[in-house]
């Protein structure tokens, strides 16, 4: 089984061909392709990491763009009556891994 560890949006994801992965927003249109930098490649018993994995390219197709669940942030100060509520939704992209080369 061939899989790769890629860096996407400040995080690392384990992917193989055909996987659907949700990442932070990717600057590409729906249906467009994007390349993700590989940190490690595992092909059976062969493992490439570091400088050996620098030439490995992982390509993915953007399936859709969406927004994540709302996260509510509350600030509260005791005895003063101060409270503040703020919400945030992350911009996300779903991509399908099309190739590891």
UniProtKB/Swiss-Prot annotation:
Annotated GO MF terms: rRNA binding; structural constituent of ribosome
Signal peptide as annotated in the record = none
Q: What keywords would UniProt list here?
A: Ribonucleoprotein, Ribosomal protein, RNA-binding, rRNA-binding
Q: Which InterPro entries match?
A: bL21-like, bL21-like_sf, Ribosomal_bL21
What's the superkingdom here?
A: Bacteria
* Presence of keyword Heme: no
One of the GO BP terms on file: translation
Q: Name one GO cellular component term.
A: cytoplasm
Q: Which SUPFAM superfamilies match?
A: L21p-like
| Cysteine pairs bridged by disulfides in the record | none
Name the job this protein performs.
Answer: This protein binds to 23S rRNA in the presence of protein L20.
**Binding partners and assembly:** Part of the 50S ribosomal subunit. Contacts protein L20.
Q: Which PANTHER family match?
A: 50S RIBOSOMAL PROTEIN L21, LARGE RIBOSOMAL SUBUNIT PROTEIN BL21M
**Family the UniProt entry places it in:** Belongs to the bacterial ribosomal protein bL21 family.
Under HAMAP family, the record lists: Ribosomal_bL21 (MF_01363)
State the name under which the record lists this protein.
Large ribosomal subunit protein bL21
* Protein's organism: Micrococcus luteus (strain ATCC 4698 / DSM 20030 / JCM 1464 / CCM 169 / CCUG 5858 / IAM 1056 / NBRC 3333 / NCIMB 9278 / NCTC 2665 / VKM Ac-2230)
């Amino acid at each position: 089984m061939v899989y790769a560890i890629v860096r996407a949006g400040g995080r690392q994801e384990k992917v193989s061909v055909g996987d659907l992965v949700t990442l932070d927003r990717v600057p590409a249109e729906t249906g467009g392709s994007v390349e993700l930098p590989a940190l490690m490649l595992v092909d059976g018993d062969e493992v490439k990491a570091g400088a050996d994995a620098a030439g490995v390219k992982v390509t993915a197709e953007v399936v859709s763009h969406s927004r994540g669940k709302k996260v509510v942030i509350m600030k509260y100060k005791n005895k003063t009556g101060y409270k503040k509520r703020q919400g945030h939704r992350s911009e996300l992209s779903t991509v399908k891994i099309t190739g590891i080369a």
